[in-house]
Amino acid sequence: MASGRDPREARPGEVEIWDLSREPWDKWLRDMLQDLNQEARLHFGRELLFQVWNYCQEEGERHGTPMMERAYKYYRLVQKALFVHFRCGCRRRQPFEPYEERRDGQGGGRANRVPPGLE
């Protein structure tokens, strides 16, 4: 070749989740978290979701992870949990209501920030 350049398309590197070209990342993530949490609440209950959210927040604070990455970690964990739950065969017909949620109406969770969709 005269130019010395390879005419083939360059092999992409590792795709960064933050580089995806769609609506602003924070708006997309917030909308997805709300939808995911509404579905997850029917199968796992607020207490468990608050515990997962708190875990992601505490791990992120410990490692200095930005808030958006913490929220995305929570999203991935809950999404995987729902996948496994459905894969094992969900037999639930009613929303999840553990004793604590019926007793005081709130469930657990002492998070500084509430996961989107669980307000």
From Swiss-Prot:
Annotated localization: Virion; Host nucleus
Note in the entry: This is an African green monkey isolate.
First-listed, main subcellular location of the protein, grouped into a coarse class: virion
Lineage summary: Viruses, Riboviria, Pararnavirae, Artverviricota, Revtraviricetes
Protein name (database record): Protein Vpx
GO biological process annotation, one example: viral life cycle
Subunit-structure text: Interacts with the P6 region of unprocessed GAG. Interacts with host VPRBP/DCAF1, leading to change substrate specificity of the CUL4A-DDB1 E3 ligase complex.
GO CC annotation terms, alphabetical: host cell nucleus; virion component
Gene field: vpx
Region (Disordered): 98-119
Family: Belongs to the lentivirus VPX protein family.
InterPro entries registered for this protein in UniProt: Lentiviral_Vpx_assoc_factor, RetroV_VpR/X
Keyword entries, A-Z: Host nucleus, Host-virus interaction, Inhibition of host innate immune response by virus, Viral immunoevasion, Virion
